[in-house]
Amino acid sequence: MSNSRSNRPQSERTRARTSAGSPSSTGKKSGAAPASPAAKSGPVARAKASTGPPPAIETVELAKRYGDAPALWPLDLRIGAGERISLIGHNGSGKTTLMRMLVGMLEPSEGTATIAGHPIGSIEARAAVSYLADQPVFYDDLTVWEHLEYIARLHGTDDWEQQAVDLVDMVGLMDRVDDLPTTFSRGLKQKAALTMAFVRPFDVMLIDEPFVGLDRLGKEALLELLALAHGDGATLVVATHELSSVKESGRLIALSSGEVTYDGDPADADLAALTEGVRQDRE
């Protein structure tokens, strides 16, 4: 495999590719609850373009409630194709709720959302987005390699084998590909889940707390994979407590109690104030 990204075969959706350890590329409130303050605007209030491709992610009054308790206030959000976003906030701030609705795992209480112009939960939206959950889930009887093959073939990836080899080598799991990931430690499970998220093609990647449990090698591999995927044009949204990684993003969105409290340039953000009391991830 060539180390030049320009020589890599291009597909309609991004493929995270590596080269054997050295990658070549790879709201407002509603319902029974009292009204809330107006949603923060920031860049999400920018006028929509009348022409051109649809945004990678768009939400209109998207909200989630559990009974009368809001998990996410109605949210209007627009993320353009190719943006790299860091999503921060305390546990319970709404980050995971938002991501799960976007990938079709959680039914919104109200509002709408699209992925690459397609309604969330549709076949097209599911094909466009790769999701790494905060708690990876594996099949009990499949090895790491069998998981990779299943996911790659499910998404029509013909040349998945070399790609899979490169990914497992990069995260340091080459000697564990024939083992069941359900038996792994938290850190090894996270590494296995990373390979599975990147082995398939995608336009949009949503990752929830990916640094949890990773050692130095794993964190370096993750950052490199994200950089390469972004370089290939993928839209990335990374929910994280790893504040040192925020500087790699072009846009920062902070949530607190289900509302946006900041949306803008990470360099202009007061991270200490936005994340007061949040414990950063540790190995």
Predicted segments, located by residue:
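Conserved ABC ATPase "signature" region
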Residues: 149, 153-176
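Helix N-cap at the start of a conserved alpha-helix in ABC-type nucleotide-binding domains
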Residues: 216-218
